[in-house]
Amino acid sequence: VSSILTKEEATFAIPYFGITPKGNFEDHSHPNPLPGLNVLHIADPERKLSGPEQSLLATVKTKLYDAQRKRIRPHLDDKVLTSWNGLLLGSLARAGVIMDEPAWLDAARKNFTFVTTKLWDPATKTLYHRWRDGERDTTQLLTAYANYLHGSLELYQATLDPAILTFAIDLADGMIAKFYDEKASGFFSSMGGADLLFRAKDDYDGAEPSGNSTAVYALLKLAALTEKATYRTKAEATLKLYATRVTELPQALPLMLQAAAFADEEPFRAVIAGDPALPETKLLIRAAHSVYQPHRVILGTTGPVEPFALTLLPREGKATAYVCTGNSCRPPTSDPAEIQQSLRPKGKPSP
């Protein structure tokens, strides 16, 4: 750094980026890590820069970047993985509607359009796992289906677009057909093949949730949205398969535990009647999302939703919400605050 920058620039940059003579990077994965390695980072994020310091920082960054460009670039990993994109899709959709960030919802829609266009074969209900430079592989993994089913359901509940729910149903059917064990229940991690000695079932939620945990939770939500019994049947059978594992080592499957809790009681169904593109309808959708209520699904009144929702209509020309459990519903309302109150967990008063 000192050889690239002037003395004044280096005096500013070295402490600002946390550079030390012995290095600030510790490689705990290597028995003999290389010494003196520094990873440039903002050492004090709370520090406020003066005007001259901001100008100095801009100059420093330009010089360091120009020097970096002269080095041989590392290989670029720019493949698209469906499983990871499913997790991102769900996060963007849910955060976008809760935080009222249209750009995040737009990014979620673009994600959905790309994957369903490039990596989905509707004729065979096949979801491919990897895409790069216009080519997709033939690998079939449960995590791709389960994670993208999860993400699609989050996007549907954020937008109430019936085409997204239709896709989710097809994806769930493809996942069950390709991975579900009809004899012992549960989902295999991959498709069978001549070079595969046996098909395993994952049983650990790590940095990425296991395919079985994600599949169970997503199927339970899909069953609540559509009232298709087969999805709940498959999910409950899988929960029973993992009951011993969850009992003996609950920390191994936290998402499976969350799915079991969801299955244990009738979820709220927040049915929003109205055009999802209108601002007044979006306010009701956001209100339904804004309360922490894990036992809840949000659905519209068109498309392949559960039959009762199809009978619910807007009242007096206004978007209307119906919060239901089982066969009973609260009085219909167009007031976002009333939706929040209806969904708020018992024993937790309004802030």
Show where each model-derived region lies.
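Glycan-recognition and catalytic cores of secretory/periplasmic carbohydrate-active enzymes
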Residues: S2-P351
